[in-house]
Amino acid sequence: MKPEDMCLVDFEGNQLCGTKKRTSEILMHLQIMQRQPNALASVHCHPPYATGFAVAGVEPPTCMVPEYEVFASVAIAPYRTPGTPEMGKLVSDLVDKHNVILMANHGVVAWSHNNVEDAYFKMEILEAYCRTILVASQLGKPVGTMTPTQLQDLLKIKQSLGIPDPRYGLRECELCDNAEWRPGVTCQVPGAAASAGVVDPEVESVVQAITDQIMGQLG
């Protein structure tokens, strides 16, 4: 990117200078800044792992990696046509309590109260975290999580940095609610007997014994 590639726009979206046309999604960036007065910069892109979560409609789980807990607070905005005011509104409705928004079937946008580099940093943290979660969930082992007390320590740091998070003030029993992630994901291929519909004789014998006992009691 060169200096002449930069565009300057006002808060109405009118381009004031720059040789190239402004992005069609400038309205979303402006709506974020209008809704969140602390937002000095915002970044929008389509990182593959984070966008995968957005397409699946899955918010990344919490209580797993400190950097993600301290620097990011993620929510999902429903899909609307890119570049429309409707899309910008759905995203900006979430920026009071979140600084990174997954855009369903689209991508990700992040804002910062510091500068554009910091907004990009938050985007990078989310992308690395989503990739880590996908790898961990495929190892066939329970995914380790922090305790609520450990998370509270991180939230105190986060709050001191002025980063929004909807979990401030929650009780410990309301934190780290990731039950669907804790067991991990085990990918197993059915054996030949299972695919052929063959029943284990020992299991069949136990089932038959229980059935006979129940029928005897009913008689």
What is each PLM-predicted segment?
Residues 1-218:
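Glycine-rich flexible loops
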